[in-house]
Amino acid sequence: MEESNPAPTSCASKGKHSKVSDLISHFEGGSVLSSYTDVQKDSTMNLNIPQTPRQHGLTSTTPQKLPSHKSPQKQEKDSDQNQGQHGCLANGVAAAQSQMECETEKEAALSPETDTQTAAASPDAHVLNGVRNETTTDSASSVTNSHDENACDSSCRTQGTDLGLPSKEGEPVIEAELQERENGLSTEGLNPLDQHHEVKETNEQKLHKIATELLLTERAYVSRLNLLDQVFYCKLLEEANRGSFPAEMVNKIFSNISSINAFHSKFLLPELEKRMQEWETTPRIGDILQKLAPFLKMYGEYVKGFDNAVELVKNMTERVPQFKSVTEEIQKQKICGSLTLQHHMLEPIQRIPRYEMLLKDYLKKLSPDAPDWNDAKKSLEIISTAASHSNSAIRKMENLKKLLEIYEMLGEEEDIVNPSNELIKEGQILKLAARNTSAQERYLFLFNNMLLYCVPRFSLVGSKFTVRTRVGIDGMKIVETHNEEYPHTFQVSGKERTLELQASSEQDKEEWIKALQESIDAFHQRHETFRNAIAKENDIPLEVSTAELGKRAPRWIRDNEVTMCMKCKESFNALTRRRHHCRACGHVVCWKCSDYKAQLEYDGGRLNKVCKDCYQIMSGFAESEEKKRRGILEIESAEVSGNSEVCSFLQYMEKSKPWQKIWCVIPKQDPLVLYMYGAPQDVRAQATIPLLGYIVDDMPKSADLPHSFKLTQSKSVHSFAADSEELKQKWLKIILLAVTGETPDGPSEHLDTLDNLPGPKEKSEC
């Protein structure tokens, strides 16, 4: 029977009650102090001895500000009810009904904090006969600070307490243990005297917590299966039966989800629930999970049709308004958690790897001689095989999610969302312009079957790009180029377009070349007819071959690499002779030499401007003029630069003329001659210097440029200046050999004529 409790104490009567309390303490003859001393002694002897409510109410000497909690009267009322039901037993110790208890109740009414601490300091009071005392738990939880409360809330949400599942007997105890595991707290830790004593977890406790986690995650999983089976599937099937779309489509999307749901909700989850209630006598889970093995075939069927199911959802959403309307209506509900149907369809795929992870953790803590060892090990072997298939499907789903993100970044204009498309690499890069010397910012998306060459566009939210060119992997070739002015460059040559790109570093360049080449190799392995299409890097020409003219986009020679027309060799100027590019070979030509048009296959057969030579080849006409025999000046710069002893830009001055920047080359085929060009791609040299017999002076005067040297012979004086001392020494090393008739590879055939010359060796020594 409930005892009558004193009315709540008002603020106005606090002083009066405090006087009454003082009088009671005075007439008890120091009972307060003695009680406090007894508590200290008892706590020192045994920290785990349960304390009476009176003792706990007097141990706290420092008042604390606590969060809102139930009133002391309410707590006492609940406590009295429990005492009446269980023979006035609290924590296994008889609670004496005496005048001292009445006085304690009065003190509790005056000091709610002490009563709250009383409940908090009694760990066993949280459970009475295996059932949680909710009132006491609420009081104990109020002792923790706001950080612990937030952590507890997060833990509860993680455990799936809002899944809408019916509560089972014993579940509150299991959930509390998992909550303690995640928060790093225990009910005993609430006692101030126990705060400095850390209890190390035993292996048995760790195994129990793993089993508890398995149970709680299984509950959450069953809830998601119910969402797929009982909500999405049923609602869409109802709409299909109205004739909005074929019911067969719905069955293909959800496959055998109903069978999977029935197995987990009617067999596996109840088995785990029962086992956790019997854990004290049967601490094992391996035997239950081993029963899962025959049903993994259901997951194999689901995984096999997963790609097609996701693609079908995408197509139905785009093409069938009724399908889109039903799915969006369900996705707005709270139970969906703001996730799409595709995300929930991934749940069965993710569950098998989850079993594998928990079993691995379980076996690490389990002793090899434990009764559950063999069952757990067999279960892990079977589940690991199924998990490998699920992981593959997960990777595909993640790739599909990434494709959707890129699809949005490209303004939803490129149809790239396809399970067969796989993103290999993406990133910023610079594109070297052919019209000028600037490097333009670009962005590349490399897939397993194509390269998207994109231009950034302005966007207030996120990164947005416009696709400039789509280059297919089929027929693509990669060339590592070397350019002193533009480091870290490489060339991507495809049927649709050829791009000269500049990476941010040598490492970035190597990563791009590796990714591109691996994509090309993988593509040709999938298509055996192209297995011989990949040539070695040294065999890949920088220019389009005659047979490929019009079929493959050429690399455009940059404007600043030539000073004259690459066909007629006339010098360019800004007014009367401007630069034009042949769309077939990429050469820079003048307007006279580019006054032709031809259909180019790589551009869809459209007419494009081409040079005279390409027009004659593509039209099938023979050359109208026989090529004249080339003189020494008509050797192309690119021809000798690619096979030279040394080549670079140098500053050059002859006699009293001003300094000018020229491209200098000493070719391997003619190592005793210095060729001077206006630019690296010129087809005609401006001048040549036979080096044999020249005197080298590498001591510049104060008026000369730094890092300069001179070549003198009779009245001819040629002054050169390099950009660095290292480059200067590189040139001098080759020139000092050439002026004596020697070559870097050994004595030259011209050495026989040196005896007839007036001592060039002596003159060249510096």
From Swiss-Prot:
One of its GO terms (cellular component) is cytoskeleton. Detected in brain, lung, liver, skeletal muscle, kidney, testis and cultured hippocampal neurons. GO terms for molecular function: actin binding; actin filament binding; guanyl-nucleotide exchange factor activity; zinc ion binding. Residues 1-150 are annotated as: Actin filament-binding. Residues 206-393 form the DH domain. The keyword Phosphoprotein applies. GO terms for biological process: cytoskeleton organization; filopodium assembly; lamellipodium assembly; microspike assembly; positive regulation of JNK cascade; positive regulation of JUN kinase activity; regulation of cell shape. Signal peptide: none annotated. SUPFAM superfamilies: DBL homology domain (DH-domain), PH domain-like. A zinc finger (FYVE-type) spans 559-619. The modification Phosphoserine is found at residues 702, 716. Pfam families: FYVE, PH, RhoGEF. Zn(2+) 1 binds at residues 565, 568, 590, 593. It comes from the Eukaryota. It is found in: Cytoplasm, Cytoskeleton; Cell projection, Filopodium. Homooligomer. The part of the protein spanning the actin filament-binding domain together with the DH domain and the first PH domain is necessary and sufficient for microspike formation. Activation of MAPK8 requires the presence of all domains with the exception of the actin filament-binding domain. This is FYVE, RhoGEF and PH domain-containing protein 4.
